[in-house]
Structure formats: C-alpha cells, structure tokens
C-alpha cells in the first residue's frame, strides 16, 4: 500500500562473488534480521523487508503470519496497536501500518515462509550500489510468500533491548592503513565523537567530525573493502562502510569496526554520535615510529 522512505528485500546476503566485483549486501542489521526469522521459525537466510524510518503499509492477501523487529516503529493492524518482536497473525485483507520509530533507523518485517522473490546470484537481497537483486517494492506491488516451514514458532514474543540511541560506542581494530595517518589522527579517532550525516545510506554512514590528518601523500591502488571499514577520503572525515559497500576502494582505511558491532552501526540514524574504541581483541596498539623516524628511513 505504501513503502515509506526506503523499503528493500533483504536476506543473509550474496556470498562468494567478490572476485566478480559483487558485494555481499544483505540485511544491514543482521541481529534484528535473524530475530525476525527465528520468531517465525523460518530457515536462516529467508528474505524479509528492511524498512528505513518506517512508513510501510502492507495488506495481506490470504492469512499470513508476520513479525517486526529492529527499530521499534509504532505498529497498527487494522487500526489496533500491535507489538514489535511479536508473532502477529494477519487475516486475509488485514492491513499492517508501520509508523516512524522514535529511535533506531531500520525495522525488519518478516513473514512466515519468507519473501519469495526470485534470487539473483544466490540471494534475494537488493544491493542499492550495484543495482542487483529485486527492485524495491512500490505501492501496489504483490510480494510472493514462500511455503510455511514445517516447524512452528516456539515463542510468541522475544524481549529484545531497544536498538538505536543518541550515541554508540563501536569497537575497532586499527588498520590496515593506519600508518597512512599521523599519530595524532589515530588518537583523534579513538577519542572524538563523529556525527552520522543525512548523506548516509546502505552503502555507508558518512561522518562529520574532526579531520584525520594523513602522514603520507598520494593515493593507494584500489584494494579490497569489507563492511565496517572506516575509509578516509581526502577531506579527512571518515566513511563507515555498511552492507552495500563497494568491493574495492582507493582511499586508506584507518580502522575496521568489529562485525559484532555493525548491527548497532546500521541503526545509527542521522544525528547519532559515534565513538570508536580499540577492541580488546586487538591488544595494545604497537609503538609506531614518529613522522621524523618514518621520513628518515
């Protein structure tokens, strides 16, 4: 009926095609995505709708069972309030309306049986950067639902902490190109707050904050990128790559956000402050040579 600012079909992602220049894509908040499928007893990897900042309205054609997870958007079924993280049974013709969440960015509408659009390269995910996968749903579109799994849901509701906040602290591992930046730049990254800007999307969160000064001039040859990379363009403000990031890039990556923290990064809406802290798994940062020592080598 209505799709809001941005609604796409997403699953666990498109694996094994980076050598062809095709990224993984998939649900930006993998934790909320997985919870929707667990609530519905769907097989892992079943496709859902990823809804950015609410605004979605759908009407059931035939009885369906659904669940909404992620950003806690106000829900109404035929005008009556409904709960997130809960199994909802929609009779034929029922309308589910999703408002704008107070916090967080992305909500996930799962349906028992999964959204059964044709897969592309083994995935039903829409990659907005590469233009692969199903077209984003439009008003009036009919989305097919796959056969219901044999297993029945074990619970009707799964309590989950709210996603999204005014500030998030994300763990990082330095590198692989932290030596392209001054010591002061690395200290700045690990001690400053960066704000998510409105120019952010599924490709990456563009951040506003202290500029990271380079210790080297010139540019790198293009090299592989991963979700969580903090790439620093010439302007000095980092970009945090998310689900639809490019497969390669030529700007240096000063650090990479730990994969376990990426779901929280994906829920950071414009205006959210991000802080970065060194992951305990990374150990103590090595003592790096000063700029003079590097220049005298």
Regions found by a protein language model. Name each.
Residues 1-297:
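Conserved "landmark" site that anchors the functional core of diverse proteins
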């Amino acid at each position: 009926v209505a799709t809001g600012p941005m609604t796409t079909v997403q699953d666990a992602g498109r694996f094994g095609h980076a050598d062809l220049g095709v990224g993984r894509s998939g649900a930006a908040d993998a934790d909320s995505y997985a919870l929707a499928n667990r609530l519905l007893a769907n097989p892992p990897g079943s496709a859902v709708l990823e809804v950015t900042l609410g605004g979605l309205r759908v009407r059931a054609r035939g009885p369906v069972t659904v669940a909404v997870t992620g950003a806690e958007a106000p829900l109404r079924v035929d005008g009556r309030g409904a709960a997130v993280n809960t199994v909802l049974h929609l009779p034929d013709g029922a309308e589910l309306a999703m408002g704008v969440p107070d916090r967080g960015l992305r909500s996930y509408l799962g349906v028992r049986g999964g959204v059964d659009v044709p897969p592309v390269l083994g995935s039903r995910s829409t990659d907005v950067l590469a233009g692969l996968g199903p077209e984003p749903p439009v008003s009036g579109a009919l989305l097919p639902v796959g056969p219901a799994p044999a297993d029945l849901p074990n619970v009707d509701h799964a309590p989950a902490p709210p996603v999204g906040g005014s500030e998030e602290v994300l763990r990082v591992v330095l590198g692989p190109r932290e030596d392209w930046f001054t010591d002061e730049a690395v200290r700045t990254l690990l001690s400053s707050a960066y704000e998510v800007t409105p120019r952010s999307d599924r490709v990456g969160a563009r951040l506003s904050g202290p500029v990271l000064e380079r210790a080297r001039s010139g540019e790198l040859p293009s090299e592989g990128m991963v979700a969580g990379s903090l790439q620093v363009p010439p302007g000095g403000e980092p970009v945090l790559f998310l689900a639809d990031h490019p497969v390669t890039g030529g700007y240096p990556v000063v650090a990479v956000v730990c994969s376990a923290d990426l779901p929280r990064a994906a829920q950071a809406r414009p205006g959210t402050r991000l802080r970065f802290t060194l992951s305990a798994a990374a150990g103590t940062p090595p003592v790096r040579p000063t700029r003079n020592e590097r220049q005298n080598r």
